[in-house]
Amino acid sequence: MNTIQKKFIALLILLMITSCGFHMRGMTEISFKTISLEGKELSFTKNLKKVLNSNKVAIVLPSENPELRVELIGEESEKRILSLSGQGLVREYEIFYRVRYRIKTADSETWGQENILETRRDFTYSDSNVISKEEEERQLNESMRNEAITNLFNQIQLNKK
């Protein structure tokens, strides 16, 4: 196959994919331009602000009448034993990350109900690999915070539509 044929086939495939409505996964178009983040400063607040800014949403004070107000009420992490070995040693842990929040739109008089976002992961544990398992747990916690940001962003989108 020569170069022209390869380019033609690539173009044909690209046309077929775009004509069926396919698009890369990512953040959707934002239906609001201003938001106020209120309440507690959580461990993921800084990254949430980055996501909002990258989507061209201005973070303003509540007194500036934002289109949407989000109150971050709190967060909590939990770790519990999922399974034990025959000798009574921990084999698996389950970790949770929860964020409590509520939303108020510009046209509503009161805050919406308190919502909870929860993410969960489990991982194996071994006393012989303590350092690597601690690093794995740290990475899983970071992953859960990022998932919570994505989920909160999606909930904000749903409330504004």
What spans do the regions from the language model cover?
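Bacterial N-terminal signal peptides that target proteins for export
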Residues: 1-9
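N-terminal segment of the mature soluble domain
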Residues: 31-76
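Surface-exposed short loop/turn segments
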Residues: 71-116, 120-138, 150
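Acidic/histidine-rich, surface-exposed loop or edge segments in extracytoplasmic proteins
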Residues: 29-35, 129-133
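Sec/Tat-exported extracytoplasmic proteins
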Residues: 52, 56, 103-107, 127, ...
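C-terminal motif of bacterial Sec signal peptides marking the signal peptidase cleavage site
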Residues: 16-19
